[in-house]
């Protein structure tokens, strides 16, 4: 008799939870949705989030507001979403591939990128182009040959220790087997100017900053870092095509929510975001920012970013990059 009573309670609870789950997707959102961007306003990641927010709001029937929570290399905003908000679908994170770099470069964070977030979707790939002065190098092979002939005489620009340009350069350096010195700068414009002035040998730059100078003949495009050629530079080979296996490094932008966000809410957010990303007007704006269309389901994106966390962790160790304290 007691077993029947317990079984009845279990069935009732299961039904209740199922009802709550179904209701959550139907009622969500009933108030404004906030997209947290952990980098500064005006960056490609920030502008991408704002483009999506503008088109997502009508589909959800609620305002979608972008909030910049910057600091500590993006970890302030990530920590806020991971630990300080309710996992109810009303706070969303949009961030770049820095999301998967930080577990290796900031090991003492109060959150875990791999365990505290659920993926929604990949927003787009953002290839980096390896630029150099045409007075010094016109091909990647020329640069590698020069670097091997005189070890540690070649240098490269980054926009911060452990940032994407740093890891991209190190992945190529390890794959091609040469030595080079890193020189950090405050941002991409400064790094590009140093390459133009021939004080720096190469820099993996966002395509948006480099393409006009490449078209004017002021910079050489030696290769792109991504697995596929960039839409804006279809004539430029990838580093792998240039002859260096396992040298590709993909930079991208994605969307996450706190881990315990109801699955049906995640699925609804993905479905509506997918509609936005499929809009020609949105694709045109994102491509202009250097972000090429890419799509992944939540399950695919979860698998993808977990693999990227491991790849970057292994790369940081292989390159001898010391984590931040």
Question: What is each model feature region?
Answer:
Residues 24-115, 152-153, 177-206, 213, ...:
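N-terminal (or domain-start) structured segment
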Residues 1-3:
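N-terminal secretory signal peptides that target proteins for export/translocation
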Residues 7-19:
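Bacterial N-terminal signal peptides
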Residues 83-90, 104-190, 239-241, 252-285:
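Hinge/capping helix and adjacent helix->loop/strand transition within the periplasmic-binding protein
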């Amino acid at each position: 008799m007691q077993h029947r009573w317990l079984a009845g309670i279990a069935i009732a609870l299961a039904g209740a939870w199922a009802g709550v789950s179904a209701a959550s997707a139907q009622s969500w959102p009933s108030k404004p949705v906030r997209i947290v961007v952990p980098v500064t306003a005006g960056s490609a990641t920030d502008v991408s989030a704002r483009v999506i927010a503008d088109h997502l709001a009508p589909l959800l029937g609620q305002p979608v507001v972008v909030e910049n929570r910057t600091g500590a290399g993006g970890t302030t905003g990530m920590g806020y979403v991971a630990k300080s908000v309710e996992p109810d679908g009303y706070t969303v994170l949009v961030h770049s591939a820095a999301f998967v770099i930080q577990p290796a470069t900031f090991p003492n964070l109060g959150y875990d990128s791999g365990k505290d977030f659920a993926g929604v979707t990949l927003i787009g790939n953002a290839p980096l182009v390896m630029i150099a002065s045409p007075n010094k190098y016109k091909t990647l092979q020329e640069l590698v040959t020069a670097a091997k002939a005189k070890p540690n005489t070649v240098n490269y620009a980054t926009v911060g220790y452990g940032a994407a340009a740093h890891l991209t350069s190190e992945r190529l350096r390890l794959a091609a087997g040469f030595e080079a010195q890193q020189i950090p700068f405050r941002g991409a414009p400064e790094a590009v100017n140093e390459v133009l002035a021939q004080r720096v040998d190469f820099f993996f730059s966002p395509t948006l900053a480099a393409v006009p100078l490449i078209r004017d003949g002021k910079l050489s495009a030696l290769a792109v870092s991504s697995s596929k050629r960039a839409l804006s530079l279809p004539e430029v080979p990838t580093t792998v095509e240039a002859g260096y296996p396992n040298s590709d490094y993909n930079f991208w932008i994605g969307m996450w929510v706190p881990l315990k966000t109801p699955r049906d809410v995640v699925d609804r957010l993905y479905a509506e975001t997918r509609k936005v990303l499929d809009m020609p007007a949105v694709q045109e704006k994102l491509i202009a920012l250097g972000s090429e269309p890419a799509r992944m389901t939540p399950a695919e994106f979860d698998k993808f970013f977990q693999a990227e966390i491991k790849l970057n962790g292994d790369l940081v160790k292989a390159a001898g990059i010391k984590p931040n304290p």
